[in-house]
């Protein structure tokens, strides 16, 4: 009998590259390596085990072997439109667990617990406690007013002409540069947030502020980080009026993600906002599978860097 290969040891989300974009190529596993092959047959190796999210643009084909490997190592594959303006589909990298999903759903279905979670999200986003005796709908309205004012403030700070947050994904090129930059920037953030949510074992669709959409929880979590990361980047790039704003935004977002160490913070933030609901995390049954990206346990004592 042939000896079995040792099990893969996925890299923790916090230690990965945030996002890579692939367009006009074939993703495959050749000679044991995850590669993208262009029309001339040239192979480019992708360190997929160290990437949180691969964004697949038009012209990209993916083999069964590539999808299998991405799933095993916990890399989220997202099929998007050109420049990331639409999300068509995403592949779950095997991280969902019944105990986490039931915990999340229980919080979302309990009105009192849901309100506590929403209030915690508000406090983290705006760095102040929300007004007392407000419903989820009222907090959503207050949040919307504050967000519009923050867009206006950032536009003035960067000298960008601003009307409103509005774009038509069916006529992308007709949109103004600030909105195109914002859409490209938030697409980057949504990708890594969804990858983190799945890696932690939760459901992207079960939201608390946002509801009724496949990525409701993604929007909830992304909104906590949006104005400290991608929104300032989008306005800064828009002020330069580049020829290819989408590409400039992607590169700037990658740098912003690295500098802010956002991948270190997303999963702890998810746990923090859910814990605000005041319900105990259920103990997983003995037969439950391990997380697709388990936390690395050190061999030293508590506090040891190893």
UniProtKB/Swiss-Prot annotation:
Its EC number is 3.1.-.-. Its cofactor is Mg(2+); Mn(2+). Keywords: Antiviral defense, DNA-binding, Endonuclease, Hydrolase, Magnesium, Manganese, Metal-binding, Nuclease. Coiled coil: none annotated. It is an enzyme of class 3 (hydrolase). HAMAP family: Cas1 (MF_01470). Belongs to the CRISPR-associated endonuclease Cas1 family. This is CRISPR-associated endonuclease Cas1. The gene is cas1.
């Amino acid at each position: 009998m042939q000896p079995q290969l040792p099990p893969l040891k996925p890299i923790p989300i916090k230690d990965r590259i945030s996002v890579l974009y692939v367009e006009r190529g074939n993703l495959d596993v050749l000679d044991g390596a995850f590669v993208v092959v262009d029309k001339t047959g040239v192979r480019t190796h992708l360190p997929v085990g160290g990437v949180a999210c691969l964004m697949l643009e038009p012209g990209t084909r993916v083999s069964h072997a590539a999808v299998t490997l991405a799933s095993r190592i916990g890399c989220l594959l997202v099929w998007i439109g050109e420049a990331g303006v639409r999300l068509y589909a995403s592949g779950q990298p095997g991280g969902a667990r019944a105990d986490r999903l039931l915990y999340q759903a229980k919080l979302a279905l309990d009105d009192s617990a849901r309100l506590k979670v929403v209030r915690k999200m508000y406090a983290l986003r705006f760095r102040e406690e929300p007004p007392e005796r407000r419903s989820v709908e009222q907090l959503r309205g207050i949040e919307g007013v504050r967000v519009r004012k923050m867009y206006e403030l950032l536009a003035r700070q960067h000298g960008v002409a601003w009307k409103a947050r509005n774009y038509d994904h069916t006529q992308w090129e007709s949109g103004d540069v600030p909105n195109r930059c914002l859409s490209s920037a938030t697409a980057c953030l949504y990708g890594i947030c969804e990858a983190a949510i799945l890696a932690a074992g939760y459901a992207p669709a079960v939201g608390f502020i946002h509801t009724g959409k496949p990525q409701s929880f993604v929007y909830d979590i992304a909104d906590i980080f949006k104005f400290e990361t991608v929104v300032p980047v989008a306005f800064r790039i828009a002020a330069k009026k580049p020829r290819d704003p989408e590409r400039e935004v992607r590169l700037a977002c990658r740098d912003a993600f690295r500098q802010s160490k956002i991948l270190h913070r997303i999963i702890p933030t998810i746990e923090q906002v859910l814990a605000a609901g005041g319900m105990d995390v259920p103990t997983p049954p003995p037969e439950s599978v391990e997380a697709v990206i388990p936390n690395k346990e050190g061999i030293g004592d508590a506090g040891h860097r190893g």
